[in-house]
Amino acid sequence: MAVLALVVFCLCAMVMALTTAEVDPAQQDPDWEKVMKLLVLPLVFAALSFVLTGCTTNVAKPGQVTKVKLKQEGPFKAQVVGVQWLNPLIRRDYPTEWQLLWTLGLSKPNEGDFQVKDKPKKFSSVQPVASIVSNIGQRKSFSSVFWQYMEDVLRPIGRRYVGNLNSFYTVQPDSPKHWRELAGIHVEFAIPARPELNPDDAAQIVRDAIIKEFEIGGRPTLSSRNTPPDVRMTAGGANAGFTSLAAALDYLEAHPQETAWVMTWDAPEHPLDERMTENCVILVLAGPDYDTRREALAWIARPVVRRVRDFDVQPGEPRAVQAWRAAMEAATAGAGRSITDIGYLIHDAGKGRDVSGRRLATLGQVLSGPLPEFNILTQGFNTTALLGDTGAGTALTNVALAIAYAHHRGVPVLVAGTTDAEAAHAVLISPPVRPRVFDPARTWFRARGEGNAYLPWWGLRKDVDWGRYMQGFSE
């Protein structure tokens, strides 16, 4: 609009100047009239054009999806828009944000929590409190448990999808062009490499569950197109999630105006249930130029992998140490940072075995050079030492925990996948510019019914007063 007004001003000034030049000198206007013609009148026309143009500009309506180029600089990173996590250690009444902090040892139950008073031994420390999918009698197959997990992890997002205008994904606004629907959502999924769960069958289970929960292709009032989810499976072990995460970032870079999900699931101790080794995670991601109209929970750079075989033996420096140093340098550089910026480490070295000690020693040796005061025990979190062998769910569970730590402590967190002796896997999670840091003295939101059970963690909208929300509530 400003450019148009400037053009109008210049054209009017030129016309007035030419008109004045062609008049006989004896008939020329007085000086004040010349000023009117050469300056004031063009300004008036320019102002009118500015105002009238502004009247025709579209204004974003509540719920409208705006696509604004944010022009992020530097290496490609993804915004974390939302996180959902299920594990038998989770209490269904506290939100996902609290669950992650509770697991990290950073949050506590509310003062006067009835369950803590009633059963202090069970609810005062991180331990299984209830099964997500019950398998009494151990009769349910691995794929059946997977199917039920998909229903449970999607339901908290689906509850608000239809009926809540403020939900990130919603079909509530009157006009479908203002929807942000889940038809065609791209999903990168890490699952265990087990014969009981074929990747093609698993992908179909996920597609069917998403279609059912969000009524894709159903009534026109709930779905504008019959496009099934685009689900891609990666079957593997503890590092499979890094592969899925890398694929999701590739997709977002190629599709800057879309969102993507990165998911994982495993139940390594099946047919046993209520085990903390069970994890199901959804990371809702968007590219750096996607206007979510929310503050990011954190930023994720590209995962990197460095193979031990690609390095030569050096005196006093094993190839594994070289590979890990290269991986950490690449992971931090991919986030526009350096290795000296690492403020916390989340890893899967485990405990109680010689191999766990070697993993910790390697990580400590690499970090002690650039960060001589870094204490891997006090500045690190050994997830599998607490939860057990979490299988294919390891990498993305660690990323979810890293998002919580980076958000609330304001430091970059390195996630290290140590289980492959022949490769170093790493990714850096960076804190957001505007976090909502929890206050230990404040009461956490708790669900009073199924409507808010297993409440996901979403970045808060930029257009609302955050003070109106209870701590831990987001939608």
Put a short name on every predicted segment.
Residues 1-277, 281-475:
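Conserved "HGTGT" condensation-loop signature of ketosynthase/thiolase-family condensing enzymes
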